[in-house]
Amino acid sequence: MPKYYCDYCKSYLTHDTMSVRKSHLQGRNHIKFYCDYYEAKAKETNIWNPSSIPYEITLEKLNRYSDAKKSNGSSEDNMDIDKKENSSDHNKGNVVNHSDAGNDNDDDDDEMIFLPPPPNLSGLPLPTAAVYNNQKEYQKAILRQTLTKS
């Protein structure tokens, strides 16, 4: 059986089976070489503009999360840190109470436009009501987040 050659990593894999290829393609080094390759191609064609990257993640933010996690010694999610920082900025040091999250007024439903639920496939049961409610909550959260940033 012939060996598989990866153009990005410039190496041969020991076997040419789907499981070996799949594990290689999901590997950290392959992904890094893949990203580096297309970044270099973008720079060659002058379409690479680091200032137009849509992500707002900086090294300061990443280091702050790792420092906070080390100092806390807890395994709380990084998004919880954002919530605490945002609440301390707006509420002068108050901690976010997650039980209050569901008590929002539904008056803002008039301002929002919701897509209708997708049609169900014939022969399959309808999805539960929680699917629609969760989608509505996600859309509200996204709208709130975009309105507070602008």
Curated annotation (Swiss-Prot):
Biased composition (Acidic residues): 103-112
Top-level lineage group: Eukaryota
Stretches for region Disordered: 66-127
Biased composition, class Basic and acidic residues, residue ranges: 80-92
Presence of the UniProt keyword 4Fe-4S in the record: no
InterPro entries in the record: Matrin/U1-C_Znf_C2H2, Matrin/U1-like-C_Znf_C2H2, U1-CZ_Znf_C2H2, U1_snRNP-C, Znf_C2H2_sf
Localization annotation: Nucleus
SUPFAM superfamilies the record matches: beta-beta-alpha zinc fingers
This protein's record includes keyword tRNA processing: no
Gene Ontology CC entries for this record: commitment complex; U1 snRNP; U2-type prespliceosome
Coiled coil (UniProt feature): none
Zinc finger (Matrin-type): 4-36
A molecular-function term among this protein's GO annotations: pre-mRNA 5'-splice site binding
Pfam families to which the protein is assigned, alphabetical: zf-U1
Keyword tags: Metal-binding, Nucleus, Ribonucleoprotein, RNA-binding, Zinc, Zinc-finger
GO aspect biological process, one term: spliceosomal snRNP assembly
Function: Component of the spliceosomal U1 snRNP, which is essential for recognition of the pre-mRNA 5' splice-site and the subsequent assembly of the spliceosome. U1-C is directly involved in initial 5' splice-site recognition for both constitutive and regulated alternative splicing. The interaction with the 5' splice-site seems to precede base-pairing between the pre-mRNA and the U1 snRNA. Stimulates commitment or early (E) complex formation by stabilizing the base pairing of the 5' end of the U1 snRNA and the 5' splice-site region.
Subunit architecture: U1 snRNP is composed of the 7 core Sm proteins B/B', D1, D2, D3, E, F and G that assemble in a heptameric protein ring on the Sm site of the small nuclear RNA to form the core snRNP, and at least 3 U1 snRNP-specific proteins U1-70K, U1-A and U1-C. U1-C interacts with U1 snRNA and the 5' splice-site region of the pre-mRNA.
Family: Belongs to the U1 small nuclear ribonucleoprotein C family.
Protein name: U1 small nuclear ribonucleoprotein C
Gene designation: YHC1
